[in-house]
Regions:
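A domain-level signal for the structural core that forms small-molecule/cofactor-binding pockets
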Residues: 2-189
Length: 189
């Protein structure tokens, strides 16, 4: 089969259609990313842009620690804590808020209408109510629709990773993952 024919059979999903929350909400993209998209720039934030956010968050977290009575400026164990926490949020814990998800390519199911199951997908997220870690495993099962698509197993992992790295409550995270897979695979729910 020629490459052209393969590409015409693929379905590449518009990642913006996968958004489940308003920008700036705990389980949505950041207001920074929203502003880029509104300007027509469909890209993730650059390292330089992230450094500006880290700098602002670092100052705010220092004030937060001071409000809690932590003398972080003089405690050798806490001196760098505001910067470390800010970097952890932007570059790891909430990186899904600052990044456009990678394109997910789905392929025709070619009449396959059985269940597709991926178990034990590791997830690290953060509860948006209490900012506590959510650690666990996700199990995904779906049945492609009549004219549905099949999503590669590694793509299911990417979907979980992307939405997990935003911060959310577990119920909203479940809905976001479900909606993404239903949209991409064109399931009949």
């Amino acid at each position: 089969m020629s490459k052209e024919k393969v590409n015409t059979r693929r379905k590449v999903v518009d990642v913006e259609k996968l958004e489940t929350a308003k920008a700036g909400f705990a389980n949505g993209i950041s207001t920074y990313l929203k502003d880029l998209i509104e300007k027509g720039e469909h890209r993730s934030l650059t390292d330089k842009e992230k450094l500006k956010i880290i700098s602002k968050a670092e100052k705010a977290y220092g004030k937060f620690l001071t409000a809690l009575g932590v003398d972080w400026e003089n405690d050798p164990n806490s001196m760098e804590t505001p910067r470390r926490v800010a970097k952890a949020y932007v570059n790891d814990l909430w990186r899904g808020r600052y990044e456009i998800p990678t394109e997910i390519t789905a392929f025709p199911s070619d009449g396959y209408n059985g269940i597709i199951l991926e178990r034990d997908i590791p997830i690290t997220s953060m509860c948006s109510h209490h900012h506590q870690a959510i650690l666990g495993k996700v199990h995904i099962a779906y049945i492609p629709g009549t004219d549905g698509k099949v999503v590669g197993l590694s793509k299911l992992n990417r979907i979980v990773e992307h939405f997990g790295r935003r911060g959310s409550i577990q119920e909203q995270l479940t809905v976001a993952i479900h909606n993404a897979i239903s949209t991409i695979a064109e399931t009949e729910n």
